[in-house]
């Protein structure tokens, strides 16, 4: 699920926060954010929220606080677009765990991650989870 309301730098807009808080006020026992990207160059679409940088913490904290005030369990859904991260949005060739023999987004083939890049991706997910915890979310969902 996504609503494409975040800013270009992955920070949350007030509209996006209000949208999700309305869901929580409706009585959902668990409220999960839209997919939030763990790296700047792994976005799957425009208007996607991010959790890759500390500059995103103020909005994430605002969202988590407002969600938690409703009594819902708040989760941030963290992910990387991988082979579905268009070069037209990210400016880099899409990546994957292995070579992809079929053209992906924008008609391009994906590039296989190196071992060091896989380790870096794991660290990006870890950093994003810690950032979400600092913001006040109850947990994360790995997408």
What residue ranges belong to the model's regions?
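Flavin-dependent oxidoreductase catalytic cores
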Residues: 1-143
């Amino acid at each position: 699920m996504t609503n494409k309301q975040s800013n270009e730098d992955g920070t949350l807009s007030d509209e996006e926060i209000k949208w999700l808080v309305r869901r929580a006020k409706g009585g959902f026992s668990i409220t999960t954010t839209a997919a939030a990207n763990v790296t700047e160059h792994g976005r799957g679409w425009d208007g996607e929220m991010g959790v890759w940088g500390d500059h995103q913490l103020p909005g994430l904290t605002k969202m988590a606080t407002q969600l938690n005030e409703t009594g819902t369990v708040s989760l941030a859904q963290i992910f990387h677009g991988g082979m579905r991260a268009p070069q037209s949005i990210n400016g880099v060739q899409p990546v994957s765990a292995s070579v992809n023999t079929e053209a992906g987004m924008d008609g391009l083939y994906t590039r296989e991650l190196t071992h060091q890049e896989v380790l870096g991706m794991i660290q990006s997910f870890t950093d994003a989870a810690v950032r979400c915890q600092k913001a006040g979310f109850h947990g994360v969902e790995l997408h």
